[in-house]
């Protein structure tokens, strides 16, 4: 019974099955969810011949107490901040993000990871990791009231 249920669930993720390993097409998952604060007001950029994109940075924090297992207040709290680049391509969401996302806003972003390359102004090839946003939820009170 459990085997049949598992097989049915797995079939939902398989689009095409074949005996030839080189022709196997299977569904995969690339999903990111982050909750944090916006680090800068968004900018909208457009490269000739391409659709515009709204870009902003977002910070997430990880905190831990150095004295785990000690009484509350006994250990020092350490915090690590990680910065993320968010890109919004979806036309409706792109425009809303450009208009309403502001520095300091607390937001929740769902999307996917994307890795790319670009050439900087000094003609040096650089790697870039970005989150392509599919959904943004505004959590700051002042933004929900606008």
From Swiss-Prot:
Disruption-associated phenotype: Morpholino-induced knockdown results in reduction in optic nerve size and mitochondrial depletion. Strongly reduced expression of the developmental regulator genes isl1 and atoh7 in retinal ganglion cell (RGC) precursors. Nonphotoreceptor cells, both in the ganglion cell layer and in the inner nuclear layer, display compromised neuronal specification, whereas cell numbers in both layers are unaltered.
InterPro entries in alphabetical order: NA-bd_OB-fold, Primosome_PriB/ssb, ssDNA-bd
Molecular function as annotated in GO: enzyme activator activity; single-stranded DNA binding
Domain of life the protein comes from: Eukaryota
Keyword annotations: DNA replication, DNA-binding, Mitochondrion, Mitochondrion nucleoid, Transit peptide
Subcellular locations according to the entry: Mitochondrion; Mitochondrion matrix, Mitochondrion nucleoid
Annotated SSB domain residues: 29-140
GO cellular component, one term: mitochondrial nucleoid
A Gene Ontology BP annotation from the UniProt entry: positive regulation of mitochondrial DNA replication
Transit peptide: 1-16
Alphabetized NCBIfam families for the sequence: ssb
Job description of the protein: Binds preferentially and cooperatively to pyrimidine rich single-stranded DNA (ss-DNA). May be required to maintain the copy number of mitochondrial DNA (mtDNA) and play a crucial role during mtDNA replication. Required for retinal ganglion cell differentiation and retinal integrity.
UniProt-recorded name of the protein: Single-stranded DNA-binding protein, mitochondrial
Organism of derivation: Danio rerio
Gene this protein is translated from: ssbp1
